[in-house]
Amino acid sequence: MATAEVLNIGKKLYEGKTKEVYELLDSPGKVLLQSKDQITAGNAARKNHLEGKAAISNKITSCIFQLLQEAGIKTAFTRKCGETAFIAPQCEMIPIEWVCGRIATGSFLKRNPGVKEGYKFYPPKVELFFKDDANNDPQWSAEQLIAAKFCFAGLVIGQTEVDIMSHATQAIFEILEKSWLPQNCTLVDMKIEFGVDVTTKEIVLADVIDNDSWRLWPSGDRSQQKDKQSYRDLKEVTPEGLQMVKKNFEWVAERVELLLKSESQCRVVVLMGSTSDLGHCEKIKKACGNFGIPCELRVTSAHKGPDETLRIKAEYEGDGIPTVFVAVAGRSNGLGPVMCGNTAYPVISCPPLTPDWGAQDVWSSLRLPSGLGCSTILSPEGSAQFAAQIFGLNNHLVWSKLRASILNTWISLKQADKKIRECNL
């Protein structure tokens, strides 16, 4: 094991077909997930040694978990540790495979006769399967999972927990689907697992997401598939066939790092009419940072220095970086409308209204001449979010943070409702 000389590794906690899990004696609540150079299909009815697969799988999982973690998805991932292992929070695994897909293919067609391959699901289709090798992982309903009354790390898996995993599965699929699109790859479907963190008692995405976990079709073309299906489809396993499978896996591993970047640049420029509005603008900048969007603050008055306002506008128009302008001006807001009337870039007015004159001042942002499409958002955080939604159309990293934020808000409401109901009992 590559990491044995640097980590104080304890007993083996679990061994599966393609990985082993070890306790870390110096890091309570953490484990080491060690991948194997083994590939399997059909619940290990077919299995082969594939040199280098452990490193490939570990790289893919580490990149995908990093992508999801940075977006805001709770994952059982701490850091990559060597070429073939990573460190993660220890979890008690929930024995369910959650499958989510956009395109009908594979076993779905067998289970749903009459549905043609290529049928698309809107929203993505979520299914669950009980992990039971002896019975070929039978499909379960949500009701069966609830009725099982599983308890992991002290958390009983009830309706709330099932709903959380179902919604998280869809969000995770959509984030990965969106992330693969810039690479001209279609994420057809995927399977994931959740666990309960033994320390926080939270449900988190766990196990691995590697090239065994999904169907990935370059250019949306099944004949170009780069996932484990290419191994399943081998009529006979030969050295040449395994080499072809390995090349497919290497192809994915080379590109997965690109998912952590975006070629689409973005920027928010906040124009304030006075430094007295700095506190309001700092809130916008902080919120932009949460979405990974660079934000610059400038001071200019469209009333007192319109020439300088337009010069600043031209400065940002000239460097080719996609930009959203946010105008922050109290009292009579000339800044937003003047900017909007002189640029093709999006402009958001975010006036810092005061209790005394706010009801009157806001009309200078709302009632505008024809030909102006300047939006008005009163919340500093809301204006940053709207800018993020604009950039998210072409930037998968920004979009992923938005999607994860929607999921996390939904989960917090679901958990709050559960807590209130328990208090009423």
Curated annotation (Swiss-Prot):
UniProt-annotated binding residues for CO2: 332
Residues carrying N-acetylalanine: 2
- According to the UniProt record, where is the region SAICAR synthetase domain? 2-260
Using the record's annotations, give every residue carrying the modification N6-acetyllysine.
36, 247
What metabolic or biological pathway is this protein involved in?
Purine metabolism; IMP biosynthesis via de novo pathway; 5-amino-1-(5-phospho-D-ribosyl)imidazole-4-carboxamide from 5-amino-1-(5-phospho-D-ribosyl)imidazole-4-carboxylate: step 1/2; Purine metabolism; IMP biosynthesis via de novo pathway; 5-amino-1-(5-phospho-D-ribosyl)imidazole-4-carboxylate from 5-amino-1-(5-phospho-D-ribosyl)imidazole (carboxylase route): step 1/1
Q: Does the keyword NAD apply?
A: no
Q: Which residues carry this modification: Phosphotyrosine?
A: 22
Q: Does the keyword Nucleotide-binding apply?
A: yes
Residue numbers of Phosphoserine PTMs: 27, 107, 274
Q: Name one GO cellular component term.
A: cytosol
Instruction: Quickly give the catalysed reaction.
Output: 5-amino-1-(5-phospho-D-ribosyl)imidazole-4-carboxylate + L-aspartate + ATP = (2S)-2-[5-amino-1-(5-phospho-beta-D-ribosyl)imidazole-4-carboxamido]succinate + ADP + phosphate + 2 H(+); 5-amino-1-(5-phospho-D-ribosyl)imidazole-4-carboxylate + H(+) = 5-amino-1-(5-phospho-beta-D-ribosyl)imidazole + CO2
Coiled coil regions in record:
none
What is one process in the GO biological process aspect for this record? purine nucleobase biosynthetic process
Q: Name one Pfam family in it.
A: AIRC
- The annotated region (AIR carboxylase domain) lies at 267-425
Keyword terms: Acetylation, ATP-binding, Decarboxylase, Ligase, Lyase, Multifunctional enzyme, Nucleotide-binding, Phosphoprotein, Purine biosynthesis
Annotated GO molecular function terms are: ATP binding; phosphoribosylaminoimidazole carboxylase activity; phosphoribosylaminoimidazolesuccinocarboxamide synthase activity
Matching InterPro entries: PurE_classII (IPR033626), PurE_dom (IPR000031), SAICAR_synt/ADE2_N (IPR028923), SAICAR_synthetase (IPR050089), SAICAR_synthetase_CS (IPR018236)
What is the protein's quaternary organization?
A: Homooctamer.
**Database matches in HAMAP family:** PurE_classII (MF_02045), SAICAR_synth (MF_00137)
The protein's role, per its UniProt record: Bifunctional phosphoribosylaminoimidazole carboxylase and phosphoribosylaminoimidazole succinocarboxamide synthetase catalyzing two reactions of the de novo purine biosynthetic pathway.
Q: Which PANTHER family match?
A: BIFUNCTIONAL PHOSPHORIBOSYLAMINOIMIDAZOLE CARBOXYLASE_PHOSPHORIBOSYLAMINOIMIDAZOLE SUCCINOCARBOXAMIDE SYNTHETASE, MULTIFUNCTIONAL PROTEIN ADE2
What is the similarity comment for this entry?
Answer: In the N-terminal section; belongs to the SAICAR synthetase family.
Q: What is the name listed in the Swiss-Prot or TrEMBL entry for this protein?
A: Bifunctional phosphoribosylaminoimidazole carboxylase/phosphoribosylaminoimidazole succinocarboxamide synthetase
Q: What is the scientific name of the source organism?
A: Pongo abelii (Sumatran orangutan)
